[in-house]
Each structure stands twice: as structure tokens, then as C-alpha cells.
């Protein structure tokens, strides 16, 4: 998965020459990799391209700023509290890094969408792989956080505290390794190519339809369904425990639990549904026509933008909602020399093993 405009198939000059010389019938854009001439000419992309150029550059610029600032703040707070960092905090730190690295690629895709790809094939492969690595890492780290909370609340166990401190780091290394493996197709098949219809260079995949379908299947399973199922199961069990709890603290924590799954599902479900429709059209299971293709292209742009917004929501959901994170943020600002406008002689102090996840305030000593 790379930003949607760059995922469209390249229409090479050699393909155009072959079609003009060998096809008496018209050409089916959905099957441009096949050796046969097909039933319909390539559809005009004016509507979707104009929409992309008006909508995506502004969105990518906004997400770049918000994602960098929000996740940078999370990373700064968690790094400043290394001695008090819990396993959940370590996962949150890796999640913030993944989201920051993802949004750092958005300026490149902004140029690709607004003008053309001017950075060469090497940077095309690196940017696409970096984008995908952090796309998968964000989803899988959310699943790790869910499982960690599940063990802590439902089974009252802290698996990462009983073993060596490196155990949680090893889990994160495994996650990053899997994501790097999933990004291998980007290093192989992404390149800067000239689209003769658009008369512009773009960073796009070059592989047959079966490869495109397989890659989309991997994205759907590893980047969405599997993490969502893990989160749904873990948080369903957590909710069952919290609902029978009479403590006000646990009832407050339940709100955050619900928001976590709902936000992930709302941000990414529309995109994967649209991609599923597009894939079914590619496979011939749904009829393809120019009007439907144009609507699907626009829908992919809108829903992919909604998905990328999840990178900006993570700091809000996992940190800024938490009272303890705000306390840690305030303590960091005080150490950096910011004036204290709260009028308190004493500032809240956190337990050395309290997670930034918590919604409940700590008690001043």
C-alpha cells in the first residue's frame, strides 16, 4: 500500500504502440497486463485526477504537520520517563515512531500527486517501503498493546515485568522484522515510470494483476483484519471485566477501551471496503465501467486519507486522553523552563510504574 494515486497501473508507451498496431477491438484498462485485446478503451481519469490534485496535497500537508507534532510530543514524553516506562509505554513509543516515519513520507507523495514524481526510482522504492513498513507496524503494535492490556486486566499478569526488560523490546523487534518482510514487494516492484496518458512520471507498482491482488490480500489480512480481530477479542474481554467492576476508576478506563477499537475500525474499514470493490472489478466479479471506476478512484482517495488520519488520532487516543500523560507532559515542559501557570506549589508525581495509558490522576505526595 502506498498513497492511492501512486497505486494506479502505469500505461507505458510500448503498451500503447502494441494496442494500436495489433488490436482492432478496443482496450480494457482493467486488464492492461494481458496479451489479448479487450472490450473497452481505457477510461478517462480527468475526474479522479482533478479531485486528487485538489484534495490530497492539502490533506497530506495537514497530516504531516499534525502527525509530526502529536507523535513527536508522545515520543518526547515517553523518552523523558525512561526509568518509569512500562511495557505499554514501550509499545506506545514504537507506535509513535511508526506514525512519525509514515507521515514523514507524505511530503514526497504530496509532490507526486500535485505535479509528478521527481525523486527517481531509488527514492520511490525507499519511500514506498518506508510507508508500508510503518503502515503495518502501526496496526500490529496496536494489537500488541491490546494483548498487553488484556493480560494485565483480565488475567492480572504482567508478562514483561517478570522477564528481562529486553523482552518487550524483542517483541517490538519481531514486529518491525515482520513489517520489513511485508515491504519486500515495494523494493522489487515500485519504480518511477512515465505514464504516457498523463505525460508525467509517477511512483507506481509494476506487476501483473495477480500480484496486485495478492498484495491487497496481504494488506487486508496483516494490516487490518488480524490486528482488528486481536483488538476486538482483547477489548471485549477487558470490557467484560470492567463492567462487573464497581470501581469508578475502572469505569473511566472502559471509555478509552471502547474508543480505541472504534477509532481503528472507523478509520480503516471504509478504505478496505473500497479496495475490495476495486479488486472485485479487476477480477471480473463486478462489472467495470468508466463511471464506476471514476467513483471508486475518488472513494479510494477519500478513504485512504481517512485511514492516514489515524496516525494523528493515536496521540489523542493513547496519550492526551490520559491524565497521567498530561502530568508527564507538564513535568517535561517545566524541566524545559516553561513557566508554571497552574499556581500549584507542588506538581503531581507519578508512580514509577504507572503507564501513560491511565485516565486517572495520580495523587500528589
From Swiss-Prot:
Annotated positions of the Sulfotyrosine modification: 27, 29
Main subcellular location: membrane
Source organism of this protein record: Canis lupus familiaris (Dog)
Protein function: Receptor for the C-X-C chemokine CXCL9, CXCL10 and CXCL11 and mediates the proliferation, survival and angiogenic activity of mesangial cells through a heterotrimeric G-protein signaling pathway. Probably promotes cell chemotaxis response. Binds to CCL21. Upon activation by PF4, induces activated T-lymphocytes migration mediated via downstream Ras/extracellular signal-regulated kinase (ERK) signaling.
PTM summary: Sulfation on Tyr-27 and Tyr-29 is essential for CXCL10 binding.
InterPro entries in UniProt: CCR1-9-like, Chemokine_CXCR3, Chemokine_rcpt, GPCR_Rhodpsn, GPCR_Rhodpsn_7TM
Family the entry assigns: Belongs to the G-protein coupled receptor 1 family.
UniProt xrefs under SUPFAM superfamilies: Family A G protein-coupled receptor-like
UniProt KW keywords: Angiogenesis, Cell membrane, Chemotaxis, Disulfide bond, G-protein coupled receptor, Glycoprotein, Membrane, Receptor, Sulfation, Transducer, Transmembrane, Transmembrane helix
Cytoplasmic side: 79-88, 148-169, 245-256, 323-365
Subcellular location: Cell membrane
Single Gene Ontology BP annotation: positive regulation of cytosolic calcium ion concentration
Residues in the Extracellular compartment per record: 1-57, 110-126, 191-223, 278-301
Residue stretches spanning the membrane: 58-78, 89-109, 127-147, 170-190, 224-244, 257-277, 302-322
Annotated stretches, region: Disordered: 342-365
The protein's assembly and partners: Homomer. Forms heteromers with ACKR4. Interacts with PF4/CXCL4.
UniProt name for this protein: C-X-C chemokine receptor type 3
Residue pairs linked by disulfide bridges in the UniProt entry: 124-203
